Every structure is written in C-alpha cells, then in structure tokens.
C-alpha cells in the first residue's frame, strides 16, 4: 500500500527564492521557518551554509534569523570587538562551497556568550564563544 503512495509521500521541495517571494508578498501570514536539511550537523554537514541567509538578504527580508551558523573566526572577531560595535565579516561558507559562499558585509554585535549552557547528551560538547550578530 505504501509503495502505491510513494509519489504522494515525497516532499515537495521549493526553491528558496520562490519561498522568499511568497513570504514577502504575505508578511502577515505568520511565522515562516526554513530548514536547510542539507547543512545539518547531525548528519555530518559543516553547519556553515549561507544559502538561506543570502536569500534573505537578496530578498530584503525583514525579521529573518539564521538559528546556528558555525563560524569560529567570526565569533572570535565579534568577541574582540564587543557588544554594540560593528565588524566587517566574511560569514560562513568556509568549509566548502556546497552550501553557499561566505556572506560579506557589516554586522552589528548584539550579544556575546562564552558558550556555557546546560545540555544533557553527547551533542554540543566543546561549544565555545558564541555571538549574535545582525548583518546590515
């Protein structure tokens, strides 16, 4: 029975540019979450993909957030500059070019953390400097 439904059970993938156009046309439709499964560190990917971030910038999307992007170089740069300061970044895309090129621009350092937090389980071991930056 499942075999007969296999085509109906396939995910409907949409180009991120089309999603951004839809979201920008319907800003009051509620929260939109983009999940880039191809850059999932739980599956062994580097977690430094910039495709979604670059699409948000290109679409002039307001209110977007990239949850996690592994970039120790930019985190160190943000920590050196301090909260409230602006830094010139080359964010993400440093492991390879499969998940997007580095995003270059000015970024405001919003907040910093030393990476200490409570988590039970094998993940997140060795997390160090964290930063929240706003790309302009």
Regions found by a protein language model. Give the residues of each.
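Active-site catalytic microenvironments in core metabolic enzymes, especially phosphate/sugar-handling
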Residues: 1-4, 8-26, 30-33, 37-131
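Conserved small/polar residues in nucleotide/adenosyl-binding loops
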Residues: 133-135
């Amino acid at each position: 029975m499942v075999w007969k439904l296999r085509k109906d059970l396939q995910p409907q993938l949409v180009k991120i540019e089309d999603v951004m156009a839809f979201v920008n046309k319907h800003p009051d439709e509620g929260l939109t979450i983009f999940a880039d499964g191809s850059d999932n560190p739980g599956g062994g990917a580097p977690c430094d993909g910039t495709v979604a971030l670059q699409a948000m910038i290109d679409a002039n999307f307001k209110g977007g957030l990239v949850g996690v992007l592994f970039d120790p170089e930019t985190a160190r740069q943000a920590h050196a500059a301090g909260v409230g300061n602006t830094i010139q970044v080359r964010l993400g895309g440093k492991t390879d070019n499969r998940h997007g090129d580095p995003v270059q621009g000015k970024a405001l350092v919003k907040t910093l953390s030393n990476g200490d937090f409570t988590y039970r389980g094998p993940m997140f071991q060795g997390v160090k400097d964290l930063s929240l930056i706003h790309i302009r």
